């Protein structure tokens, strides 16, 4: 295992340039959202259900932001790449994150920050969280009082 890690550290395996571009878009998106007054709580929060790019506060609302980057609008573009299956994974990951968070009682919103051809598009409330997440948040609020 140590050899493999040494091999990777030396840079003999080239990183995927799309991954680097996605990270740049995420950093740019974070700056944009902070400029709009949102406060960062977590970045790249991972759990058994997946990864949440950005978890932020917009006033009293907890916002889960999925950042997507595409070089063009082929195949529907960046925002269209977040279909029902991805939305469900994000919702499950958010529910898991909320379960262990002091923010469990807050209202939840899912936003998408889509970058296409250098342009950013912020879709507030891009999709509704499933009812089970809302009910988990309310139950957690009751337990914390």
Swiss-Prot record:
Gene3D superfamilies: 3.40.1350.10. GO terms for molecular function: nucleic acid binding. Pfam families: UPF0102. HAMAP family: UPF0102. Belongs to the UPF0102 family. This is UPF0102 protein BAV3162.
């Amino acid at each position: 295992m140590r050899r493999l890690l040494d091999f990777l550290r030396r840079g003999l395996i080239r990183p995927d340039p799309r991954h680097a571009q996605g990270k740049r878009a995420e950093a740019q998106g974070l700056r944009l959202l902070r400029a709009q007054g949102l406060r960062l709580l977590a970045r790249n929060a991972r759990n058994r259900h997946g990864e949440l790019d950005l978890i932020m506060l917009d006033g009293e609302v907890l916002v889960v932001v999925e950042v997507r980057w595409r070089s063009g609008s082929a195949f529907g573009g960046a925002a269209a790449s977040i279909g029902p299956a991805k939305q469900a994974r994000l919702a499950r990951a958010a529910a898991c994150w909320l379960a262990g968070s002091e923010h469990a009682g807050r209202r939840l919103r899912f936003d998408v920050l889509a970058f296409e051809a250098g342009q950013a598009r912020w879709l507030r409330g891009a999709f509704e969280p499933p009812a089970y997440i809302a009910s988990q948040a309310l139950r957690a609020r009751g337990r914390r009082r």
